[in-house]
Structure formats: C-alpha cells, structure tokens
C-alpha cells in the first residue's frame, strides 16, 4: 500500500521540477531576448572598399567564373568587419547570382543549393544591420523563396512571400519588379505567376506615374521621365545596373509570352529598344529573336528546364543571363 506521505512528496517533487524547468526556460528566453544586437559598422574598411571594386567588376563583366574569386575577397572583408551591411549584402548577392545563372555550369552539383541558404543568411545580416535599405529586404525575401522552393518548405515560402509584400511597400519601384521576377518560374496558370505579372504592370505604372495602357503599352511617351535621383531612379539604367531598363522589358515580355499573350509581349519587348544604351546591350540579339519567335515561344516558356545556350528558349529567370541581363556592361 502506498503511503499518503509518499504520494504527497512525489507531488511536491513533480511541482518543483515543473517550476524549475519553467524558470530555466524563462531565464533562457530572457537571456536570449536581452542579448545586444550586433552593432552596424560606423565606417567601411579599406579591405571592404577593395572588395567592392572586385565585386562590381566581376558583376559588370558578367564574369560568372570569377564569382569564387570575388567571394574570397568579399567574405574576407566581412569577416574583418561583420557589422558592414553592404559587404554582407554583396556576399548574399554573389551566392544568389551563382544559383540564378547555374545554367552556365557544365556539370551541376547538388551543392549549388547551398547558395540559397547562404544568400538568405547574408541578406538577413544585411537587413538586420541596415533595416532602412529596402533593396536588402527584397533580396532577403527572394532568397527565402528560393530556399523554400528547394526544400519544399511551405512555412518558409509564406514567410518569404509576406516579407516580399513588406519590401514592396517599402520601395515599390524596386521591389515590384523583384517580386514579379521571383514569381516568373511559377506555372502560368498559378495565382502566384498571375500576381507576379500584375506586379510587372504595376512597376510600369509606378515608373510612368500613371496607368500604362494595357492594350498598347508603348513606353515612348514616358522616356522624358528618366532620372538618376529619388526612388524612381531604379526604373532606369544606372551604374549599378547598366541595362536595367532593357532587362526589365525582357523579363516582362517573357512573362507575357508564358501567359500566352505573345502579341502584347512583342510591344513590351520593343520598349527595350527605347533605351539610349540599347546598342551596347550584350543581349539585344536575344531580345530581337524573342520578338520574332514570340508566338512559338509560348509553349517553350512553359517548360521548367533551364537554358544552356545564350539564346535558348527559356524565360529570363531560367537563363544564363538571369542577373547579367541587367547588370552586365
């Protein structure tokens, strides 16, 4: 027979154990929550500035094979000054570039998926260090969605999606395009793809300052709005993205073709020719072939494969110039 005193003692011990565990959990929570945030760097080091130079040269040259060399320099600068938001973002971008243009690789290793994880890590650092930079927010959301797609992680997909909506609110001219580009590989009949295409139209509206005619979306009337200052500067070419304008219309045209609206896509593609830098654009031949083959490309663009040749019939997001299309000089 159990002693009533023994039963009572066991109850007291059980309560004490639960209380101790709760207290310990509370202490752990408080210890973590009250830890100081990593402080942003007050200045940028000479090492970081030298790494910047190599980063931009590699990107602007479209030197995909030079990514590893640039990564060494930029990560070295980050380790020296881990509070440098710009350097953290550059590491993230190199990882996302290597993943985005993986069609360039002759033999693709499963290890390429690590670039999505590392891109998210470094863009997370950049956002934490400089939460006011909306471009970092958009890149973080993009990397979250890329990682989620690889791992079939629905929770991370939703987190990335809503973070992207926040990024759009923070800088619509920039992140509406970013968001739509990320959605372009989705099935053409999916809600996400349709939303992504709507975001491209909204980008045009934001940049034009009015609603662009959906039936005849020539951008010729708005070319006088070209600016290098303010939030609308990202609508145009710049030293960061020397062919941003052309690349935008390449992607939007691809999305319209994929959606089956190849006739409107031809007008959208043709807008790229309005750029004063069009003659120097490395991918103008690809765009002109897309105009010619717009109707034939409807079926091709709905395939999920990635292209191997520069002119392969795949959407820009799946091509060898997924980033270089805007950034290569």
Where are these regions (language model features)?
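Bacterial N-terminal signal peptides that target proteins for export
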Residues: 2-16
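Bacterial N-terminal signal peptides
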Residues: 14-25
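Bacterial Sec signal peptide processing site at the extreme N-terminus
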Residues: 24-44
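Short coil/linker segments at helix-helix boundaries
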Residues: 33-40, 49-73, 93-132, 138-238, ...
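Extracytoplasmic c-type cytochrome modules immediately beyond a signal peptide or single-pass transmembrane anchor
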Residues: 65-68, 73, 194-203, 212-231, ...
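TPR alpha-solenoid repeat register
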Residues: 87, 136, 174-177, 248, ...
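The canonical Cys-X-X-Cys-His
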Residues: 319-329
